[in-house]
């Protein structure tokens, strides 16, 4: 559903195998839910789209983690969430045929929006619906829902190296990949590893724009 503003790194050069050779990546488990949620919450705190979509009248970001936790728990039903080191970065994928959340998590998301976001809850839920409507369905693919680098480790290329690690695995299966970029500054970085613009949509009533991107099978 969301790819954020946390990666401030140069474009990848060299082959994917060269880029990932020194990266310590492990598969996340249910026991890592707190850590993954923390990384995503911190990395998206100032994202152009999600900071706007979850802004409460009184300010504050303490509630953000409750929303991201649902996405993390939904993704951890599959073996496609990855962590770098002790929590430097994380990537969250939904494999072909999977869903972002279980039905009970989707219901809880709607309840949480009403409880935490007050007058902007409707716009938030409409935004989520726009993500779903824009998602391509014709061809099975891997779906990058979230990619974030912990703020303490930004600027070192870790996020893009993690993405390269993931794409190496996906390429081994000769499968396409899809993501949504909520920060225009990241679009060129995704293009550097083979993603192409697919479409776009905006925040309800005007505001930040999301670019959808597709990477053909290799």
Regions found by a protein language model. Name each.
Residues 73-93:
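Conserved beta-hairpin
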Residues 24-38, 42, 46-47:
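A short beta-loop-alpha structural element at the N-terminal edge
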């Amino acid at each position: 559903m969301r790819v954020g503003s946390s990666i401030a790194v140069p474009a990848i050069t060299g082959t994917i195998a060269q880029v990932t050779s020194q990266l310590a990546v492990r598969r996340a488990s249910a026991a890592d839910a707190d850590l993954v949620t923390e990384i995503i919450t911190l990395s998206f705190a100032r994202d152009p789209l999600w900071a706007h979509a979850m802004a409460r009248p009184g300010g504050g970001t303490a509630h953000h983690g409750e929303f991201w936790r649902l996405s993390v728990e939904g993704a951890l039903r599959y073996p496609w969430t990855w962590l770098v080191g002790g929590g430097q970065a994380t990537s969250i994928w939904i494999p072909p045929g999977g869903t972002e959340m279980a039905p009970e998590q989707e219901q809880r998301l709607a309840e949480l929006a009403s409880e935490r976001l007050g007058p902007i809850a409707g716009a938030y839920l409409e935004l989520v619906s726009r993500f779903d409507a824009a998602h391509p369905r014709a061809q099975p693919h891997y779906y990058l829902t979230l990619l974030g680098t912990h703020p303490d480790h930004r600027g070192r290329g870790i996020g893009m190296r993690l993405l390269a690690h993931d794409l190496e695995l996906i390429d081994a299966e000769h499968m396409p990949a899809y993501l949504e970029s909520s920060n225009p500054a990241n679009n060129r970085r995704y293009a550097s590893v083979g993603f192409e613009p697919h479409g776009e949509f905006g925040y309800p009533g005007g505001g930040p724009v999301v670019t959808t991107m597709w990477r053909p099978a290799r």
